[in-house]
Amino acid sequence: MSSRSFGKLRINFVEGSSAFFLVTINEYLVTMHSRLWLFSSKLFWPALFIAVVVALTFLLWSGRSEKMSYCEMACTFEERLPSCLDSIREWNEGLAYFDSSVAATQDTLQSFKNLLWNFWDIEFAGAGLPSISEESVLPLRVLENKKSGCMGLSWLALMVAEARHLRLDAILLPGHVFLRYESSNEIFNLEPNRRGYSYTDDEYREKYKNGNWTGLEFQPLKTKEFVGLAAFNIGNLYLETDVPRALTWYRMAEEFFPAYPGIGVNQSIAKMRLPDSL
């Protein structure tokens, strides 16, 4: 047995295990409780739960040589075992539909689009807050509720691509992501908020020309970077209402996507909003 530390949270684990049932949190409980009591005792358990999720994510993926899994991270963000998709009926029925459609039509791209926007019938949640809520960002909730913004739909699509070895990337734009599908001889852009409509790169540049460009746009996001961006979006949901929780998500975002400038900016804002006694 060995241990790793994340701040004041120490996790003991057996080598080779996922460590989900071997978390030692006594010291962390006391520390977090004393700090969060000033806000409200009601904030303690949710904040602790999120902190453990983040620590477990670091434990599972920090320093690992293999590529991070979109599917496993979808489960981890929901405080489930990494293999949770095995028991989700709608997910498995969707993959079966995709496989049968490809076998019947030999059209992988259309089968992929039909899965997302016909079989699962995922709809755009709407502009503004509905599209950036946890219900619209976390892919397992998107699959359950059939509503999504660009992040949630893209994450779900990337999970399918991972499971079926499709060449699919998430592409960053100012405040947005879209999907890029590559076949043997063609490349297609898929707009997640418009049921896979294909804008050209030039059309995207025109649509987002007034956004905050970072230099990271139009480059395929690595899995860790996409997961970091999702953590950043979730942190933003709590920036006004639950600063400790926002900072916890920003810490994960910073770990996985350190090059994204918005993370540091919002972290600084959140830290300034903490009471002096914390």
Predicted regions and their residues:
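Intrinsically disordered, low-complexity segments enriched in proline/serine/threonine
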Residues: 4, 24-26, 277
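Short Gly/Ser/Thr- and charged-rich N-terminal loops/segments
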Residues: 6-15, 19
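A structural boundary/capping signal
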Residues: 41-278
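N-terminal basic, low-structured, amphipathic or hydrophobic segments
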Residues: 1-6, 31
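Short hydrophobic targeting helices and cationic amphipathic motifs
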Residues: 13, 21-22, 29, 34
